[in-house]
Swiss-Prot record:
UniProt keyword Transcription present: yes
Gene transcribed to yield this protein: hilA
TPR repeats: 372-405
Function (record text): The main transcriptional regulator of the Salmonella pathogenicity island 1 (SPI1) gene expression. Activates the expression of invasion genes by a direct action at their promoters and also indirectly by increasing the level of invF. Also binds upstream of prgH and directly activates the expression of prgHIJK operon.
Protein name as annotated: Transcriptional regulator HilA
Lineage, top ranks: Bacteria, Pseudomonadati, Pseudomonadota, Gammaproteobacteria, Enterobacterales
Induction annotation: Expressed in response to both environmental conditions and genetic regulatory factors. Transcription is subject to complex control and is stimulated by the SPI1-encoded HilC and HilD.
Length: 553
């Protein structure tokens, strides 16, 4: 059985909170050395390498103690000692015990790694696939060349489209191989199979024209080209010796400075308030500029734009464009990154691209079945689609994995209000406030609105005072104005109308419908309702479920 050897194998570092764990066996906290014995160090490295996934007790015992005669009690003592070294308390839990399963490191971790040395380069020519549709063939050829070009840092040099696009006959192929002498080439033929297609692929070593591999790949209708690229990339990895790509390698940040900026941005994103999201946007944009080849900042930026849209503090159309751009960039860096695939799944389903969205979610879940990120995105997707019971179940799974995720808690509160009613929503809101979201302004504004709807005006006014004025914008402002209407009836209408007049693109924001209904009446609200419905407004699907709009259904 292999034994864990804590001898340094690289210059990478693990960074979490104010700790830095080096591969030379040292642990620093706020730049001061913390003593960590070899066994505790080995367990910590394995948990950090697992990147939030569960590590079984048997795995830890096998890798750290090897063939030594030990039992689970030794591991339990080691975990206890490690928690003391990390100064764990009730508010700062680093290691989570999952009874019957193992342990998981449950805090954000960033791996800092200097750029890896360039491996030996292998040149690849991708020939245009034989297809009935010439235009489709050219488009697919371009997509595959572009996708596989992303693997250049790992030893794969792909000839450009301009050189290979006209290479279709045997004569053309032989001339290209003779003139440019690539190491390998890929050819393919697409054969219709009902509504789907079969792609027959050959990988050939040019020296001696030796056929290395043949494979038939079924392409389902509407399946994104990136999935075909990923399958081809995996085939190349199996067939070409010396290729060394690792999906985790290109997600690592390359300096302590960019890591610290990322962690600050991620922290602000997780706070999930209007002010914190604006701060996250600045920090994560800065991080992308510092580490343009790292995946994590692009994913966080995409989620940030989506969150700002949900909160009504960023133009919805522009935010969706930005979110998609950053999610696509992440998949260009790694076609198999589950978080990026989950984000694209959410974005596609918001835009009613249900088949593509479903495929992306399925792929993300296969790659990372126990991921709080994927559970959150999928639960959000189900909520938008009106599948409230399934959405609630999925969000609960997310919160089980990450109880401190503010955005998931807020989403659960909306779902509860829509699905089981205001009394359950008030109880859940109180529960969330007593746990991790006691000062969150969006939660407070929702509780103020719920209490006002129930006629508990004094308690609602008391809660309103706890909301910072700098946070009263977007959806928080809408919630508080609706609460003011519940408390003051007609006297609140001038303020609501003034707010609606100041809002830009009111005709593109279904989230304002509850205020429009009370301020301008049922006829105008119904006109807006029908407009959103006829236009298939992407956010209307979420707001049409609101119990306050039952008159318009």
């Amino acid at each position: 059985m292999p034994h864990f050897n804590p001898v340094p194998v690289s210059n990478k570092k693990f960074v979490f909170d104010d700790f830095i764990l080096n591969m030379d066996g040292s642990l620093l906290r706020s730049e001061k050395k913390v003593n960590i014995p070899p066994k505790e160090y080995a367990v910590l490295v394995i948990l950090l390498e697992a990147a939030g996934e569960i590590v079984s007790k048997n795995t830890l015992l096998d890798q750290v103690w090897g063939d030594a005669e030990v039992n689970e009690e030794s591991l339990t003592r080691c975990i206890y000692a490690l928690r003391r070294i990390l100064s764990e308390d009730k508010e700062h839990r680093y290691i989570e015990t999952l009874y019957g399963q193992g342990y998981r490191f449950n805090r954000p971790v960033v791996v800092v790694s200097p750029p890896a040395p360039q491996p030996t380069t292998h040149t690849l020519a991708i020939l245009p696939f034989q297809m009935q549709d010439q235009v489709q063939s050219e488009s697919l050829h371009y997509s595959i060349v572009k996708g596989l070009s992303q693997y250049a840092p790992f030893g794969l040099s792909v000839l450009p489209v301009t050189i290979t696009k006209n290479c279709r006959s045997v004569k053309d192929i032989l001339e290209l191989m003779d003139q440019l002498r690539p190491d390998y080439y890929i050819s393919g033929q697409m054969i219709p199979d009902g509504n789907d297609n079969i792609v027959q692929i050959e990988i050939v070593r040019v020296k001696g024209y030796h056929l290395l591999h043949q494979e038939s790949i079924k392409l389902i209708e509407h399946q994104p080209a990136s999935l075909l690229q990923n399958k081809i990339a995996n085939l190349l990895l199996r067939c070409i010796p010396g290729l060394r790509w690792d999906t985790k390698q290109i997600s690592e940040l390359n300096s302590i400075d960019s890591t610290m900026v990322y962690l600050r941005g991620k922290h602000e994103l997780n706070q999930y308030t209007p002010y914190s999201l604006q701060q996250a946007l600045k920090l994560l944009t800065q991080c992308v500029n510092m580490s343009p080849n790292s995946i994590a900042p692009y994913c966080a930026l995409a989620e940030c734009y989506l969150s700002m849209t949900q909160m009504g503090i960023f133009d919805k159309q522009n935010a969706m464009i930005k979110a998609k751009e950053h999610a696509i960039k992440a998949t260009e860096l790694d076609h198999n990154n589950p978080q990026a695939l989950g984000l694209l799944g959410l974005i596609n389903t918001i835009h009613s691209e249900y088949i593509v969205g479903s495929l992306l979610f399925k792929q993300a879940n296969l790659l990372s079945p126990i991921s709080a990120d994927i559970k959150y995105y999928y639960g959000w997707n189900l909520f938008m689609a009106g599948q409230l019971e399934e959405a609630l179940q999925t969000i609960n799974e997310c919160l089980k994995l990450d109880p401190t995720r503010a955005a998931a808690g807020i989403t659960k509160l909306w779902i509860t209000y829509y699905h089981t009613g205001i009394d359950d929503a008030i109880r859940l809101g109180d529960e969330l406030r007593s746990q991790h979201l006691q000062d969150n302004p969006i939660l407070l504004s929702m509780q103020v609105m719920f209490l006002s709807l129930k006629g508990k005006h004094e308690l609602a006014r008391k809660l309103t005072k706890e909301i910072s004025t700098q946070e009263i914008t977007g959806l928080i402002a809408v919630n508080l104005l609706y609460a003011e209407y519940c408390q003051n009836s007609e006297r609140a209408l001038p303020t609501i109308r003034e707010f609606l007049e100041s809002e830009q693109r009111i005709d593109n924001n279904p989230g304002l419908l509850p205020l429009v209904l009370v301020a301008h009446g049922e006829a105008i609200a119904e006109k807006m309702w029908n407009k959103f419905k006829n236009e298939d407004n992407i956010w209307f699907k979420r707001w049409k479920q609101d119990p306050r709009l039952i008159k318009l259904r």
